[in-house]
Structure formats: structure tokens, C-alpha cells
From Swiss-Prot:
The active site is at D66, E133. Its EC number is 3.1.26.3. This is Ribonuclease 3. It catalyses: Endonucleolytic cleavage to 5'-phosphomonoester. SUPFAM superfamilies: dsRNA-binding domain-like (SSF54768), RNase III domain-like (SSF69065). Mg(2+) binds at E62, N130, E133. Its cofactor is Mg(2+). It is found in: Cytoplasm. NCBIfam families: RNaseIII (TIGR02191). CDD domains: DSRM_RNAse_III_family, RIBOc. SMART domains: DSRM (SM00358), RIBOc (SM00535). The keyword RNA-binding applies. One of its GO terms (molecular function) is metal ion binding.
């Protein structure tokens, strides 16, 4: 019996050691607080209770990592493109931080081999990208901003993202938004708020996008097409970051469906 206990303890520490070195290889530096990375790799489908009985998973770290990653990318772009305007910087950042890109990078980093997740949801979309963001949040808490920036540059940007190529790619946010609304049976509308002239007497359009009559994003541009694109881009950002807003929009879908019945 005592031998069995020793074998169990030995297997536990062997697994911990293996996980530590796998983490070390991924990070490129030794982790200080190993437990924070374990939490970052713990999907809510495998939540664990802490000593206070509260469920622990990586959702809070994902929230933090998303903000830190966006801030780091903003700094990189601000320095790389000193003469470009806010619209260009925002558009370029959105291409870098989009979920499909983060999903692929997470797999390339090997996060799929370390994540603790229920087999039932492992293939759900964007789980790996979300976990990568939680991982970035863990690095920030463990090592601070500068080390996190170093990780993003050396382990994400340099090997996997060609910023100059991304800049040349055009993202049609209005088309993507329209497809998303069709898929989820959501009413998409664009309303002109006002037209005005700038200092050079050029006409500027201000347009808002509405999802099921909820204001989702406001855009400006020198044509209706440009301002609708900008409003669609702001709407995508809101869809991605504002869960309360999404619930309100989808509540409208359910209400409409029940009325139809």
C-alpha cells in the first residue's frame, strides 16, 4: 500500500515536471508562478472549486489577456506606422487580433496539448484562441508588461504574423456583419445620423449600425460606403467584447420568434 502511495506521488510530480518544461519551451523563459498558467489552461468545462468553494477557470484571465494583447498590438502599430491615422491603426489591429488568427497560432504554439477541457467541447470554435488570450493574461500577472510584450513579439508576431502583408489585405466588415446577422436571424440596419463638412469643405457622413434596433456601432467617412464600413467595424468590436449587449440582441430574436408562433 505504501509503495502504491509513493508511486502515485511520483507520477503526480513527474506530470507536474513534464508540464513545467512544456510551459518553459512555449514561453521561452521559466515561469515564476506556475499555478497562474495552470489556471489559464483550465477551460470552464473543466472548472475546479477552490478552498472557498468558488469555481475556477480561465475566463477572467481571458478578459485580462484580451485587453493586454490589444494594448501591446496598439503600441507596436503606433510605433511601426508613425504617419497613419487612427482608422488605419484600428483596422490593422483588428486583422491581427481576430479570433481565426489566434486559433491558428494557439495550435502552432501547442496550447491544444496543454489545455484542460472536456472532450465534449474541445472542438468548439475559438476555444484555443480564447485560451491563448488567457495565457497572455497569465504572463502579464506573472512577469509584467515588458515580458508579456517580449512574448507577443517573439512568439506570436515575428513567427506567425506578417504585418506588412496584413496591411494590404482589405477586410469587408459590412459583408461579414451581414453574413453573421443572416446566420443568427438578426435585423441589421444602417441609419444616417448627420452629414457635415470638414475644414476643407468635404462632406462627411456619420452613420450608425443597429442590430435588432439596438445601437451597435457608429462610423464616419467621406462616403456612405466608408462610414458604413467603419460602423460595421465598430459593431464587430462590440459583438466580440460586449456579452451583455449580445444577450440583449439575441433576446430580441427569441421575442420575435415567440411572437411569430
Amino acid at each position: 500500500m505504501f509503495r502504491n502511495i509513493l508511486n502515485t506521488i511520483g507520477a503526480f510530480f513527474s506530470k507536474k515536471k513534464e508540464s513545467y518544461f512544456a510551459l518553459y519551451r512555449m514561453l521561452g523563459f521559466p515561469p515564476k508562478n506556475f499555478s497562474i498558467y495552470e489556471k489559464a489552461l483550465l477551460h470552464k468545462s473543466s472548472s475546479k472549486r477552490d478552498e472557498n468553494g468558488c469555481y475556477q477557470n480561465n475566463e477572467r484571465l481571458e478578459f485580462l489577456g484580451d485587453a493586454i494583447f490589444n494594448a501591446i498590438i496598439a503600441v507596436i502599430l503606433y510605433k511601426k506606422f508613425p504617419t497613419n491615422d487612427e482608422g488605419f491603426l484600428t483596422n490593422t489591429r483588428s486583422k491581427i487580433v481576430k479570433r481565426d488568427t489566434l486559433d491558428k497560432i494557439a495550435y502552432q504554439l501547442g496550447i491544444n496539448h496543454l489545455i484542460m477541457i472536456s472532450a465534449k467541447v474541445k472542438n468548439h470554435k475559438h476555444i484555443m484562441g480564447n485560451t491563448l488570450e488567457a495565457f497572455i493574461g497569465a504572463i502579464y500577472l506573472d512577469k509584467g508588461y515588458l515580458k508579456t510584450k517580449e512574448f507577443v513579439e517573439k512568439r506570436i508576431i515575428n513567427p506567425y504574423i506578417d504585418i506588412d502583408t496584413l496591411v494590404r489585405e482589405e477586410v469587408n466588415f459590412k459583408s461579414k456583419l451581414f453574413e453573421w446577422c443572416q446566420k443568427h436571424k438578426i435585423l441589421l440596419q444602417f441609419q444616417t445620423l448627420e452629414n457635415f463638412t470638414d475644414n476643407n469643405r468635404n462632406v462627411v457622413f456619420q452613420i450608425q449600425a443597429l442590430l435588432n434596433n439596438h445601437i451597435a456601432g457608429i462610423g464616419i467617412g467621406y462616403s456612405k460606403r466608408e462610414s458604413q464600413q467603419h460602423a460595421s467595424q465598430m459593431t464587430w468590436r462590440k459583438i466580440r467584447t460586449d456579452k451583455i449587449f449580445l444577450r440583449e440582441v439575441f433576446a430580441g430574436v427569441k421575442k420575435t420568434n415567440s411572437e411569430d408562433k
